[in-house]
Amino acid sequence: MISPEILRRYPFFGFMTDAELKAVAMIAEEVSYKEGETLLESEKPANSLFFLVEGSVDHLYVVNDHNHTKTRKEFHIDEFAPGDIVGISALIEPYRYTATVRAHTPTCAIKIAGDALRALCEVDTALAYRLMRETAKAAMERLHSTRILLAAARAT
């Protein structure tokens, strides 16, 4: 459990009431990762949602050749910094991560249990709607950023 005041610092949670913040804080914890440690891995079950507090992480797109188990390539997409959200797949079916996120520097994050957050949404549909609205905004921002990076890569 963390203090609801920690969540209040993030615009993503700006819509939440005190009671909602308290409920989410109950299913959250602060976690730390050393440089090079993996926060979440592509194709694995999306069990958690993360908000970066300190440090930076690399957002990697992973290509696996399922016919040849030794063939795996990682492509660096972007780097995330404090305030960014990662692991939104924990809120979107089929609840599997679509990328790998690895600590670029020593990193501290708020980790929220995905199953518990989804359970809160099942009970409170208004919370679910507002949470999904914020999740959609985060996904759209990520898509926009990726398009810019792709355009820049093609321009060179």
Predicted features along the sequence, with ranges:
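Cytosolic regulatory regions built on CNB/CRP/Popeye-like sensor folds
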Residues: M1-T156
